[in-house]
Regions:
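P-loop NTP-binding/switch modules centered on Walker-like glycine-rich loops
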Residues: 78, 92, 212, 216, ...
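Conserved ABC transporter NBD signature motif
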Residues: 99-110, 458-469, 479
Length: 719
């Protein structure tokens, strides 16, 4: 078996996968039509709770849905909405302390009533799961071939030889190169994307009728994410399984789901076909969730509308509709009576909202009045009119690491070229985003900037000072105040033993500020990042993810830096919280004339709040320029592949646009090609004439400017 290559999708060439809802294939609640096939999985009144010191945590409250053969149900919602608890309940993987009620019917059998022994005979055979973290699903001391062989032999009467042959075929099916040899390798010898392919192979090994994928692409680059989603779709088609796809990425849902269930506070609040839900959401929560999503597919910079407030605690849910405290169109009845999940007249699908009929009739906007949410859009035109001074200048930056072998007596066997000749400038009031796959050198570049030491090669200048000229610790400390960092995970960045006040006071005290100065500065910092001053007395554990990230930003701003380095500042946040933080960063940049150097993998977010982009691959910048220029007219084939892999939260456009799926894995930076670093994966190289192909193999391309004279620059022989 071999992995079928990806192909463009469009009206004449529809993408793979099950049929979409339509007259002959109705979605949920679509009304009269041909009889639907019997569901392979039916969930009825599913309830999951966990004990806690404050009382029972109601994680899942009365969830109902049917999963049809060959179709994909996407489950979306904020953290804590009950998505993962639902997935674990389906698989029978809830912890022993959890309390489960309701029915989970698979082929007429109630999984909720089974003990672990009976469930073990069903898991992996009739229902398979793709986990978020592939390493948690793979035994590190067994080769991947042996893992697959064992999964096959547990449920089938196979000899070791036959099981091994089927394991090799499964690896081939999910796109593992040289599957017979790679079957002998161990999980740690695979990249993250390759490990996820192995997990998918495990999930489909026995051709289950149901697959459950819980955030299967969360930690992956966009190019690898696109590959994994294609593999998952192919696996579903090969096995004929129905798929439950749990994700926070609405673009992934738009491109791969047939039906969508939106969860909030432990229950489904809207359930409809994917086209209907994205085109005309009926539940106010769904409408606000979609309004908070940035999109990379359009040059129109609409404002992001974050959802006000925080999700309710599952220990103390409010009376009535759980979303009422955050809803812009809530009425008194919404605060006293919880609505049932019903189908409004004239609309497909089901929704739990007292005002659903008004929304369905078009007499009420589910997102509320235009002024009900504060939203900002970047003023790039103003930034171009008033360019600030250069805050950071990097020229020909080089960073290498030794490659060693041996446990005790290490010997050097090679050199890993992490960053090679990188150069850029960042001005006051400007955001430069470094984008690219993992291993491209983005984070190493950030670390070299933050070291404030002479680099291995090249030059780094911060606030007009060449870091190579710093001779004393006092000079370094003085320059350190000009550049600060906001880390990816605010939980890891904040000392859990300190209150917010002490966390913000720490950098001020380290700089020698007295008690009076500290006490006057901290309230202003909290105001600056939009936090109530009462938060100062709390510990990080008592804050939401968005609040913790705001504290991290306030801490970085404590000493009034000119440059903020942001390392994936949004990847650990829900989409609604992400919109709040994006809007905050845009406002702070404008008000304080800050310069931002950002590393991010979400190109939709990058498009929203960056002014310029530098695309990195294997330690080299292969293309750079103004954000809108890069998105509108990408030149380098790697940039084109990156942009084509970004999911769009629009089912029609997402399923019809052409994709460029890169072949193979990014090569090791310890063995760089002699010519272009992208040559082994470049689609243009495969189509070029022999003279260009020879140059690509033997000569490193120089960076050239676009013909229009703009600052758009790229390095490619084939253009």
């Amino acid at each position: 078996m071999t992995l079928a290559p990806a192909r463009p999708t469009g009206p004449e060439n529809p993408g793979p996968g099950p049929e979409r809802p339509g007259p002959e294939n109705p979605g949920p609640g679509s009304g009269p039509g041909p009889a639907r096939p019997a569901p392979v999985l039916s969930v009825r009144d599913l309830r999951v709770s966990f004990p806690s010191e404050q009382g029972p945590v109601q994680a899942v409250r009365g969830v109902d849905f049917d999963l049809l053969p060959g179709r994909t149900l996407g489950i979306v919602g904020e953290s804590g909405s009950g998505k993962s608890a639902t997935a674990l309940a389906l698989m029978g993987l809830l912890p022993p302390a959890a309390h489960l009620e309701g029915r989970i019917l698979l082929g007429g059998r109630d999984l909720a009533a089974m003990d672990d022994t009976r469930l073990a005979r069903i898991r992996g055979k009739d229902i398979g799961m793709v986990f978020q973290d592939p390493m948690s699903a793979l035994t590190p001391v067994l080769s991947v071939g042996r893992l697959l062989s064992q999964a096959l032999r547990v449920h089938q009467d196979l000899s070791r030889k036959d099981a091994w042959e089927q394991a090799v075929q499964l690896l081939d099916l999910v796109g593992i190169p040289d599957p017979r040899e790679r079957a002998k390798a161990f999980p740690h010898e695979f990249s993250g994307g390759m490990r996820q392919r192995v997990v998918i192979a495990l999930a489909i090994a026995n051709k289950p009728s149901v697959l459950v994928a819980d955030e299967p692409t969360t930690a992956l680059d966009v190019t690898v994410q696109a590959q994994i989603l294609e593999v998952l779709r192919l696996a579903q088609r090969e096995s004929g399984a129905a798929l439950v796809l749990i994700t926070h990425d609405l673009g992934v849902v738009a491109g791969h789901a047939d039906d969508v269930a939106v969860m909030y506070a432990g229950r489904i609040v809207e359930h409809a076909g994917v086209d209907e839900l994205f085109a005309r959401p009926t539940m106010p929560y769904t409408a606000r969730l979609l309004a908070a999503v940035p999109t990379a597919g359009s040059g129109v910079q609409r404002p992001l509308l974050p959802i006000a407030g925080e999700p309710p605690s599952p220990v103390a849910l409010p009376a009535g509709c759980a979303f009422a405290p955050r809803c812009a169109v809530a009425r008194d009845v919404c605060r006293t009576t919880e609505p049932d999940l019903t189908a409004p007249a004239g609309r497909p699908g089901r929704v739990a909202c007292h005002r659903a009929q008004e929304i369905a009739d078009g007499t009420l906007d589910p997102a509320g009045p235009a002024g009900s949410a504060v939203a900002l859009t970047p003023d790039r035109a103003a930034a171009r009119r008033t360019p600030g001074e250069v805050v950071l200048r990097v020229e020909d930056l080089v960073k290498t690491f030794p490659v060693t072998r041996g446990a005790l007596l290490k010997r050097r066997t090679g050199t890993l070229h992490a960053v090679n000749g990188v150069g850029f400038e960042v001005r006051a009031g400007e955001t430069l985003a470094l984008v690219g796959e993992s291993g491209s050198g983005k984070t190493t570049t950030l670390r070299e900037v933050l070291r404030l030491r002479a680099p291995e090669g090249g030059r780094i200048e911060v606030a007009g000072t060449d870091v190579a000229t710093l001779r004393s610790a006092a000079q370094v400390r003085e320059l350190r105040s000009e550049v600060q960092i906001v880390l990816q995970d605010p939980t890891d960045a904040l000392d859990p033993r300190l209150t917010v006040f002490d966390l913000l006071a720490e950098p001020l005290r380290a700089a020698g500020a007295d008690r009076t100065a500290v006490r006057s500065r901290i309230p202003r910092l909290l105001d600056l990042v939009g936090l109530d001053r009462a938060v100062g007395d709390r510990f990080p554990a008592a804050l939401s993810g968005g609040q913790r990230q705001r504290v991290g930003i306030a801490r970085a701003l404590a000493r009034e830096p000119r440059l903020l380095v942001l390392d994936e500042p949004l990847s650990a946040l829900d989409v609604s919280v992400q919109a709040e933080i994006v809007n905050l960063l845009v406002r702070l940049k404008r008000e304080l004339a800050l310069a931002y150097l950002v590393v991010a993998h979400d190109l939709a977010v990058v498009r929203y709040f960056s002014d310029r982009i530098a695309v990195m691959y294997l330690g080299h910048i292969v293309e750079s320029g103004a954000t809108e220029e890069i998105f509108a007219r990408p030149r380098h084939p790697y940039t084109r592949a990156l942009l084509s892999a970004v999911p769009l939260p629009d089912p029609q456009r997402e399923r019809r646009r052409e994709r460029i799926v890169l072949r193979g894995e990014q090569p090791s930076a310890a063995r760089l090609p002699a010519g272009c670093v992208f040559v082994d994966r470049c689609p243009l190289h495969r189509e070029a004439d022999e003279s260009v192909r020879t140059r690509c193999r033997t000569e490193r391309p120089s960076t050239v400017g676009a013909p229009d004279g703009s600052d758009h620059r790229y390095a490619c022989h084939a253009l």
